[in-house]
């Protein structure tokens, strides 16, 4: 295969395949940011919200004390697993206000997310198919920026997955000269 001179990536731009994946990833990252803040446009039938309310009442949980973890347990118990990614939205419907980020913080997070694409491609294990977990990445970027008030709101990975992702994240941080903070 020959590269036509114009198709050669310059030192300023990553190869086209990285750009393509980065474009898809940044859109997914923005979607995760929206879900996290319950800004998503999703429809959850009223009867599902009512069933969740009944379960909360049955378990004698005060709504202000409803955690993401407990909400996930309730969804699982009710067979509503497909709504896991909408937990913040569901809690908002129950009267629990979601965490809100400033537009400036969102923009900063998106820019940092774009910054990690080339180092990720460089250090990604060859047997790895997917990108880093998006909530893990959002957690690490907020941690890096000192935005610790958001950290308790992110669903975290199981221990082994954290270790695997931390190994890649450490290499990315080293490459970008960012502080690496171990997750465990």
What are these language model-derived features?
Residues 1-184:
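Non-catalytic, interaction-prone regions of core transcription and DNA-replication machinery
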């Amino acid at each position: 295969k020959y590269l036509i001179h114009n198709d050669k990536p310059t030192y300023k731009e990553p190869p086209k395949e990285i750009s393509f994946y980065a474009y898809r990833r940044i859109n997914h990252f923005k979607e995760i940011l929206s879900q996290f803040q319950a800004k998503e446009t999703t429809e959850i039938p009223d009867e599902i919200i009512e069933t969740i309310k009944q379960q909360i009442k049955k378990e004698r949980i005060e709504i202000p004390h409803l955690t993401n973890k407990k909400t996930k347990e309730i969804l699982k118990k009710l067979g509503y697993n497909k709504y896991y990614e909408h937990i913040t939205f569901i809690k908002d419907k129950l009267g629990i206000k979601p965490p809100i980020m400033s537009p400036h913080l969102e923009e900063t997070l998106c820019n940092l997310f774009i910054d990690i694409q080339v180092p990720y491609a460089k250090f990604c294990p060859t047997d790895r198919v997917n990108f880093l977990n998006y909530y893990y990445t959002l957690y690490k970027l907020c941690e890096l920026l000192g935005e610790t008030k958001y950290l308790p709101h992110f669903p975290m990975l199981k221990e082994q997955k954290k270790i695997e992702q931390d190994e890649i994240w450490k290499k990315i941080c080293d490459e970008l000269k960012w502080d690496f903070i171990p997750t465990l």
